[in-house]
Amino acid sequence: ITEVADEMKLDTYVIGGFVRDIFLHRPSKDIDIVTVGNGIELAQKVSGKLKNKPQVHVFKNFGTAMLKYKDLEIEFVGARKESYQSDSRKPTVESGTIEDDQNRRDFTINALALGLNAHNFGILVDPFNGIKDLENKIIRTPLDPDITFSDDPLRIMRAIRFSTQLGFEIHDQTLR
């Protein structure tokens, strides 16, 4: 992925649950890759570089692509901004930066990203102190909870699920 992202001159990161699980020493087989550019094209070029040339499944409605490599499912997406209408769960999507993409994440612990380019490989991008929340076992939204939950009310259920699965507390402000 690093080689292809560098060839394409795309800033690329692994983000979300896979990064969280690295720091929690938990196994994870789902990898989310976000790139500042075309995630579908990146997935197709990565597949072309792999020995077994895995099939790339493209989900145009979501602007994502997924491939299976060994026992991993790797999903690729372009960094984006999302906004929601109050009467719909379907977001309006625009291209964005890594910071925009992190802003749209459900919780600080899922907004963690690691650089995948040669110049930033393994460098943590953590604008919301998600590492501190991991250490303190706290579930917190990266933005105001009213914004995060009104964008997608199912995130409330995800907070409860993560709290139960990980043994974390939901932050007071997030609960309100």
Feature names for model-found ranges:
Residues 1-176:
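Catalytic cores of the polymerase beta-like nucleotidyltransferase superfamily
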